[in-house]
C-alpha cells in the first residue's frame, strides 16, 4: 500500500484492546475439587477407549437425528443452496429444517439390492449432517462442519426397514480402514433429564477420531444388502485450543483469606471435559500460566463512567470496593491480560486466556466479583474463579461472539431472542446423552422460564444461548448451557482463523484451509506496514526467560494513574521490538520511510522503556503507540490531556529478556523517537 492511501481503521481503544462486553450471568455454586497441577492437561471425548483400541465391529448405544425440533417462524434467512428435504425432527415434534441453515443433499444413485442411506450425521458438540450446516443472514454468515480428528457418534437413517446387521464402513484412498457394527435405534442413548427421544429411526456407532479426517468416506452395508453410496463428510478444522489460566490475586488476597490457588489455577478435570464437549475443537489443552499466580496490590482503572453514568478520570484502586463502577477493575484487568497475551506472542495463536480475579474489599474480606468481561474476538476474558456460567459466556466473547439477542435484532443471529429455537440438538459425550433445544425439567430456570424465554406451540421454553442469558437452562449435573449450532459454527471459524504452531510444517506454522480441508504451511507476514506489529507479533524467540513489564500512563496527569506494575518473570516468548539507541532500529520504524513505515504512524512512538538489570547492563525498548492523533504522529490528539477521555490513557505490556534480575524500570519521554534518541531523556516513571 502506498503511503498516500487511506489509513486502515483504528482499533477500538487507546490501549489497543478490543471492546469488552460486560456481563453478569447467573452462576451456579457447584463445588470444585482440588486441582493443583501447573502442567498442561488435555481432554478428548469420553468413551473413546474401546473404539480406538479396536477398529473391529462392536455394538454401541447411541442416539440419532441430524437436526432439531420445532423450527421457528422468525429469524430465517435465504439459504445458500436450494433447500433439501426437511430432516426428521425428534419424536413428537414437527419436522422442519433449520431456519437460515442448509445441508448438502445425500447421494441418491442407489441401485437394486443396494442399501440406501436417507440421512447421515455426526454428533460431536451438535448433531451435524455430513455436509455441514451453513447460514446466510442479512448481516452475517456462518457454517458448522464436523470437527476433524475428534470422536463422533455417527447417526444413520436407513431406507430399508428389513436391513439385517448393518455395518458402517470407512474408506480412504480406495483402502478400507475398518467397519463398525451399527447399534439399532432401540439402543440410542437418552436425552438429558429423561426428556423426549431425539429420533426413533437412527442407527449409530462411535467413530474414532482417526477416521474423522478429510478424505475418508463412509458407507453402510447389511448382510442382505450391498454397500450404500459413500458419503464424504466436509470437515472443519482439526486444530486444538489451548486455554491459559492467569489467576490474579488482588489487594492482599492469598490462600489464607480467599479461594486457594489449587482451586483457581485451572478448572477441575470434570469441568475441563465439559468445556471440551461445548467447544468445536479437536482437543482442549488447559494450562496454568507459567508464572503461576499474579499478585497485585494496586490496579489502575482507566477513564470510564461511574455507577451514576458520570465520566471519571483514571484512578488507582487498592481494594475492590474502591472502584467507581462494577466493572472498573475487570476492565483494567482485561486490558492488562490482552496486552500481556500479545506481548508473549500468543495474539494470533489458538490460545484463549482467562483470568480469574480473586480480590479483597477494604475490610480485608474476599469480594464476590459478580460478573465478567470478555474482549470480543480478542482471545481473552476475565471473571470469577468458579468456572461456571460467567466463564463460558466470557470466553464466548473471546471467541468473537456478541450477545445473541442483540445480534438477532441486527440480523446477525438466526434464532429469535438469542434462543435455540431452530438450532440442531446438542450432544454430550461425557454423559452420553443428547441435549434438547427445550429447557429440561431439571434446569434451575425451568419453573419460571415462560416469562423470559421463547416458547414453542405447546408453550414449552426454548433454551437461551449462553451468550443471551442461557446460564440456568442446563440440566442438573451440568455447569454450562448449550450453545446454538450457529454460535458453535462461529467459534469453529475463530479457531480455523488462528495461526497454529506446527512442527510438521516447513515454516513452523500452519493455518487451516477450509476449501482444501487441510492445514497449509503458513509464513508469518507483517500486515499494514507494521501498524500493529511485526510478523503479526509472533515470537522471534520462544521458551526463554522473560520479564513482562506493564505500564499505565495518564497524559492528563490523573492522580496515581501513571504506574509501573511489578514485573512478572517466567519462561515465555519474545516478539520483535525495537531499540531506540540503535540507528538501524530507528530507521526500521521511521514514519513513511522505514522498513515498517506505519509502526509509529498510528498514534506515535513517544515513549521508551529502560530496564536496568542487577548487573548494571541496560536494555531499551520503544513502546508502540501513544497519544497522537490517528494517522498524524506529529500532532497530539485533541483529547490527549482530557482526563475524562480514554485518549489520555494508555496501558503498555512488553516482554524483555529475563535471564538477569531487574534492578530498575523507567519510562522515558522520547518524542518521535524515530528521529533520534535524546541524550538525556526525561524520566517520567521509575520503579
From Swiss-Prot:
<dbReference type="InterPro" id="IPR019503">
    <property type="entry name" value="Peptidase_M66_dom"/>
</dbReference>
<protein>
    <recommendedName>
        <fullName>Dictomallein</fullName>
        <ecNumber>3.4.24.-</ecNumber>
    </recommendedName>
</protein>
<comment type="similarity">
    <text>Belongs to the dictomallein family.</text>
</comment>
<keyword id="KW-0378">Hydrolase</keyword>
<dbReference type="GO" id="GO:0004222">
    <property type="term" value="F:metalloendopeptidase activity"/>
</dbReference>
<feature type="binding site">
    <location>
        <position position="393"/>
    </location>
    <ligand>
        <name>Zn(2+)</name>
    </ligand>
</feature>
<feature type="binding site">
    <location>
        <position position="397"/>
    </location>
    <ligand>
        <name>Zn(2+)</name>
    </ligand>
</feature>
<feature type="region of interest" description="Disordered">
    <location>
        <begin position="73"/>
        <end position="112"/>
    </location>
</feature>
<feature type="region of interest" description="Disordered">
    <location>
        <begin position="1"/>
        <end position="45"/>
    </location>
</feature>
<keyword id="KW-0479">Metal-binding</keyword>
<feature type="binding site">
    <location>
        <position position="403"/>
    </location>
    <ligand>
        <name>Zn(2+)</name>
    </ligand>
</feature>
<dbReference type="GO" id="GO:0046872">
    <property type="term" value="F:metal ion binding"/>
</dbReference>
<keyword id="KW-0482">Metalloprotease</keyword>
<keyword id="KW-0645">Protease</keyword>
<dbReference type="Pfam" id="PF10462">
    <property type="entry name" value="Peptidase_M66"/>
</dbReference>
<feature type="domain" description="Peptidase M66">
    <location>
        <begin position="233"/>
        <end position="501"/>
    </location>
</feature>
<dbReference type="GO" id="GO:0006508">
    <property type="term" value="P:proteolysis"/>
</dbReference>
<keyword id="KW-0862">Zinc</keyword>
<feature type="active site">
    <location>
        <position position="394"/>
    </location>
</feature>
<dbReference type="InterPro" id="IPR051256">
    <property type="entry name" value="Dictomallein"/>
</dbReference>
Amino acid at each position: 500500500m502506498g503511503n498516500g492511501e487511506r489509513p486502515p481503521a483504528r482499533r477500538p481503544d487507546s490501549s489497543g484492546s478490543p471492546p469488552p462486553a460486560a456481563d453478569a450471568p447467573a452462576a451456579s455454586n457447584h463445588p470444585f475439587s482440588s486441582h493443583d497441577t501447573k502442567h498442561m492437561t488435555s481432554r478428548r471425548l469420553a468413551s473413546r477407549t474401546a473404539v480406538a483400541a479396536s477398529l473391529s465391529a462392536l455394538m454401541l448405544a447411541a442416539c440419532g437425528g441430524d437436526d432439531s425440533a420445532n423450527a421457528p417462524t422468525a429469524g430465517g434467512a435465504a439459504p445458500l443452496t436450494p433447500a433439501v428435504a426437511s430432516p426428521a425432527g425428534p419424536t413428537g415434534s414437527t419436522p422442519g429444517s433449520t431456519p437460515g441453515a442448509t445441508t448438502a443433499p445425500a447421494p441418491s444413485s442407489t441401485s437394486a439390492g443396494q442399501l440406501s442411506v436417507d440421512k447421515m450425521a455426526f454428533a460431536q458438540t451438535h448433531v451435524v449432517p455430513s455436509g455441514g450446516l451453513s447460514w446466510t443472514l442479512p448481516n452475517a454468515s456462518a457454517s458448522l462442519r464436523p470437527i476433524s480428528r475428534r470422536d463422533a457418534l455417527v447417526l444413520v437413517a436407513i431406507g430399508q426397514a428389513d436391513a439385517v446387521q448393518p455395518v458402517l464402513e470407512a474408506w480412504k484412498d480406495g483402502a478400507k480402514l475398518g467397519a463398525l457394527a451399527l447399534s439399532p435405534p432401540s439402543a440410542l442413548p437418552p436425552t438429558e433429564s429423561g426428556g423426549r427421544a431425539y429420533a426413533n429411526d437412527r442407527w449409530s456407532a462411535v467413530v474414532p477420531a482417526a477416521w474423522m479426517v478429510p478424505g475418508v468416506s463412509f458407507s453402510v452395508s447389511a448382510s442382505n444388502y450391498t454397500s450404500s453410496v459413500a458419503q464424504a463428510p466436509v470437515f472443519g478444522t482439526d486444530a486444538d485450543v489451548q486455554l491459559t489460566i492467569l489467576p490474579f490475586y488482588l489487594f492482599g488476597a492469598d490462600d489464607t483469606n480467599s479461594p486457594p490457588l489449587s482451586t483457581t489455577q485451572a478448572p477441575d478435570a470434570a469441568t475441563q471435559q465439559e468445556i471440551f464437549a461445548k467447544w468445536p475443537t479437536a482437543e482442549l489443552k488447559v494450562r496454568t500460566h507459567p508464572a503461576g499466580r499474579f499478585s497485585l496490590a494496586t490496579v489502575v482503572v482507566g477513564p470510564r463512567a461511574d455507577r451514576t453514568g458520570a465520566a471519571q478520570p483514571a484512578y488507582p484502586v487498592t481494594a475492590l470496593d474502591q472502584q467507581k463502577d462494577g466493572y472498573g477493575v475487570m476492565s483494567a484487568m482485561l486490558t492488562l491480560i490482552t496486552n500481556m497475551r500479545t506481548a508473549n506472542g500468543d495474539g494470533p495463536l489458538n490460545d484463549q486466556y482467562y483470568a480469574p480475579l480473586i480480590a479483597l474489599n477494604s475490610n480485608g474480606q474476599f469480594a464476590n466479583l459478580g460478573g465478567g468481561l470478555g474482549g470480543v474476538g480478542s482471545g481473552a476474558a476475565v471473571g470469577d474463579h468458579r468456572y461456571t456460567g460467567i466463564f463460558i459466556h466470557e470466553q464466548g466473547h473471546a471467541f468473537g461472539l456478541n450477545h445473541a439477542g442483540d445480534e438477532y435484532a441486527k440480523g446477525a443471529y438466526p434464532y429469535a431472542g438469542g434462543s435455540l429455537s431452530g438450532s440442531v440438538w446438542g450432544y454430550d459425550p461425557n454423559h452420553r446423552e443428547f441435549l434438547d433445544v427445550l429447557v429440561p425439567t431439571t434446569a434451575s430456570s425451568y419453573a419460571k422460564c415462560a416469562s423470559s424465554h421463547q416458547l414453542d406451540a405447546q408453550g414449552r421454553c426454548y433454551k437461551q444461548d449462553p451468550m443471551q442469558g442461557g446460564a440456568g437452562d442446563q440440566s442438573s449435573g451440568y455447569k454450562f448451557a448449550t450453545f446454538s449450532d450457529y454460535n458453535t459454527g462461529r467459534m469453529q471459524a475463530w479457531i480455523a482463523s488462528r495461526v497454529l504452531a506446527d512442527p510438521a510444517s516447513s515454516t513452523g506454522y500452519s493455518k487451516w484451509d477450509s476449501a482444501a480441508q487441510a492445514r497449509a504451511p503458513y509464513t508469518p507476514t507483517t500486515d499494514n506496514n507494521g501498524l500493529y506489529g511485526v510478523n503479526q507479533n509472533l515470537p522471534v524467540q520462544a521458551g526463554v526467560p522473560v520479564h513482562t513489564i506493564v505500564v499505565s500512563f495518564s497524559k492528563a496527569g490523573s492522580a496515581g494513574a501513571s504506574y509501573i506494575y511489578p514485573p512478572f518473570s517466567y519462561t515465555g516468548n519474545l516478539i520483535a521490538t525495537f531499540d531506540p539507541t540503535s540507528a538501524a532500529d530507528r530507521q526500521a520504524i521511521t514514519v513513511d520511510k522505514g522498513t515498517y513505515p506505519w509502526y509509529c504512524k498510528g498514534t506515535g512512538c513517544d515513549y521508551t522503556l529502560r530496564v536496568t538489570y542487577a548487573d548494571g547492563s541496560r536494555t531499551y525498548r520503544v513502546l508502540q503507540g501513544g497519544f497522537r492523533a490517528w494517522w498524524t504522529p506529529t500532532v497530539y490528539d485533541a483529547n490527549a490531556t482530557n482526563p475524562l477521555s480514554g485518549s489520555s490513557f494508555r496501558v503498555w505490556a512488553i516482554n524483555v529478556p529475563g535471564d538477569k534480575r531487574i534492578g530498575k524500570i523507567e519510562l522515558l519521554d522520547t518524542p518521535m523517537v524515530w528521529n533520534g534518541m535524546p541524550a538525556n531523556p526525561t524520566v517520567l516513571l521509575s520503579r
